[in-house]
């Protein structure tokens, strides 16, 4: 008897390269791993047309028709409420009612965040589900959370981010006893804004995490911590700056290398080494960012995602289910209730 599949609903219509790259990524995922089954949700005729180009085990891939598409420019709350037959809403209901374990989308971030809270729903006790992208560092990767749309956070939320992020890094990424740092503007404990000052002692006194103190933004690329905690406004700034600097550097390097004939010869020698270096700063190998703390896994992958990111976002869902991430998060959160009762 086959063990049951990890069932993943995929928004086939979301993102700049939908449906072509989404469908391709889904096929690559099922061909790469027998444990996963994908439900491609979206306009069936269009999806079927794309699927003709590929061979795959039909047992592992189904198409679910959804007539509507939520566009990136639409106000998320309204779109989720009104477009009941959209790929995002339909796929999220599949997670809510247990047909699927996870949902992957490259579509509207706002709609995914709102739908995650409203349709899939939070684990009891979780104050706010953080969007947690993996960012490349010299040592591997770090988890940066929150990078969602929730701009005002409370100290208790940041503590939950630290716990959920630690569970994820340990169980999905295999990092033993992950180091947790809080984003700050100096290493000293008395630095920072009100939120950081209030959160610092709470993290320091939290036995479930390995808190190493403040982390300055410039130490993030060096891999100063495995789990990096901040409010979403700060997280978004760090993430976008990261992406911008990476692509600017890449551009400079390409321009510089091709500028003279003599350097072209040198460029040929440098290129393989450089490619390897830049590849280590490429996040596509991990796929999207999980939205943690929901009753099911929601993965938001970049709007510009190609097949490889989609594939890896889908495969990420396997470890999430097999390592029972949500059970571990529930355990961490219910420890809070017990602690509150004892005080």
For each feature predicted by the language model, list its residue ranges.
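N-terminal charge/polar-biased segments
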Residues: 1-10, 16-20, 49, 54, ...
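Short beta-strand segments
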Residues: 11, 40-42, 64, 105-107, ...
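Short glycine/serine/threonine-rich phosphate/pyrophosphate-binding segments
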Residues: 18-22, 85-98, 102-116, 123, ...
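Glycine-rich phosphate/diphosphate-binding loop of Rossmann-like nucleotide-binding domains
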Residues: 20-21, 33, 37-39, 44-48, ...
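N-terminal glycine-rich anion-binding loop in soluble enzyme alpha/beta folds
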Residues: 21-72
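Phosphate/nucleotide-donor binding subsite
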Residues: 56-100
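Glycine-rich phosphate/nucleotide-binding loop
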Residues: 117-130, 134-144, 224-228, 232-342
């Amino acid at each position: 008897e086959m063990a049951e599949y990890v069932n993943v609903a995929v928004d086939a219509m979301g993102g700049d390269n939908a449906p072509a790259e989404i469908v391709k990524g889904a096929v690559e995922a099922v061909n790469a791993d027998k444990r996963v089954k994908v439900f491609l949700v979206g306009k069936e005729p269009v999806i079927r047309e794309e699927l003709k180009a590929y061979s795959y085990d039909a047992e592992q891939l189904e198409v679910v028709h959804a007539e509507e598409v939520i566009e990136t420019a639409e106000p998320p709350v309204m779109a989720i409420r009104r477009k009941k037959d959209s790929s995002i809403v339909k796929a999220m209901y599949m997670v809510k009612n247990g047909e699927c374990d996870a949902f992957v989308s490259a579509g509207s971030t706002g709609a995914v965040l709102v739908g995650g809270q409203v349709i899939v729903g939070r684990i009891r006790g979780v104050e706010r589900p953080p969007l947690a992208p993996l960012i490349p560092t010299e040592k591997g990767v770090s988890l940066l959370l929150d990078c969602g749309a929730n701009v005002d956070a409370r100290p208790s939320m940041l503590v939950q981010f630290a716990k959920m992020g630690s569970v994820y890094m340990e169980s999905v990424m295999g990092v033993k006893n992950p180091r947790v740092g809080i984003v700050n503007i100096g290493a000293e404990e008395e630095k920072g804004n009100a939120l950081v000052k209030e959160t610092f002692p709470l993290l320091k006194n939290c036995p479930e995490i390995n808190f190493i103190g403040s982390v300055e933004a410039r130490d993030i690329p060096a891999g100063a911590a495995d789990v990096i905690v901040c409010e979403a406004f700060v997280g978004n700034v760090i993430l976008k700056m990261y992406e911008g600097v990476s692509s600017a550097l890449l551009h400079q390097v390409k321009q510089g290398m091709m500028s003279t004939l003599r350097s072209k010869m040198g460029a040929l020698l440098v290129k393989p080494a450089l490619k390897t270096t830049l590849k280590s700063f490429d996040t596509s190998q991990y796929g999207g960012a999980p939205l943690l703390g929901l009753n099911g896994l929601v993965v938001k992958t970049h709007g510009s995602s190609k097949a490889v990111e989609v594939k890896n976002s889908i495969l990420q869902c396997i470890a999430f289910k097999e390592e029972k991430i949500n059970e571990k998060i529930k355990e961490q959160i219910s420890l809070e209730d017990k602690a509150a009762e004892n005080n």
